């Protein structure tokens, strides 16, 4: 059995949309991180990516969390909320509660949680100020929920100003390109 069993859940950010391979598959930050982890360890790790593009935060939890935990991972990454922020009406506190649910289930199963915030596309989008405000609210709400939890790995991409520049984004300006996924990994 591998020392590391890493499972990723999320939406297009974790799936890898925007970083298409020549054969049409996508390769995102989670795939790159898993390979880097194996390379650093000097042996393979077990890895599964359950992420599905377009998913809202709570459906990610409802559809992906339990199947992911059934694999008995040592580490589980979660990102969500980016699609929720694009909706006309959304409650950031309710979305942040999804992160609390994942953390609780990880605690119950003895799984180390890797928490990611999405990269910030606000500067490139119409209604960017709304996206900026919602992303700031979601980030703050999630960080309050994991405050004092040194066991939670945090990869905070939202405040990374370099990552929000155009060089890291695909043509649609909603998804990161290969450079963006590599920076996050």
Feature locations, PLM:
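Flexible, glycine-rich phosphate/dinucleotide-binding loops
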Residues: 15, 56, 122
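Alpha-helical cap/lid subdomain in secreted, periplasmic
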Residues: 36-39, 43-46, 59-183
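Short linear motifs at secondary-structure transitions and domain/linker junctions
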Residues: 26-27, 51-54, 88, 128-131
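Serine-esterase "nucleophile elbow" of acetyl-processing enzymes
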Residues: 1-53, 65-72
């Amino acid at each position: 059995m591998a020392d590391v069993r890493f499972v990723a859940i999320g939406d297009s950010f974790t799936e890898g949309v925007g970083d298409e391979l020549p054969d049409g598959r996508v390769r995102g930050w989670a795939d790159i991180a898993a390979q880097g982890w194996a390379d650093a360890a000097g042996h393979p790790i077990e890895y599964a990516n359950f992420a599905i593009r377009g998913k809202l935060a709570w459906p990610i939890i409802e559809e992906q969390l339990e199947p992911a935990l059934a694999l008995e991972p040592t580490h589980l990454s979660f990102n969500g909320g980016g699609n929720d922020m694009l909706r006309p009406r959304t409650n950031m506190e309710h979305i942040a509660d999804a992160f609390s649910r994942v953390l609780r289930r990880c605690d119950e199963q003895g799984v180390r949680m890797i928490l990611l915030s999405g990269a910030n596309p606000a500067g490139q989008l119409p209604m960017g100020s709304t996206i900026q405000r919602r992303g700031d609210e979601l980030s703050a709400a999630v960080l309050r929920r994991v405050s004092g939890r040194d066991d939670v790995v945090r990869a905070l991409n939202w405040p990374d100003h370099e990552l929000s520049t155009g060089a890291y984004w695909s043509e649609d300006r909603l998804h990161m390109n290969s450079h963006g996924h590599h920076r996050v990994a």
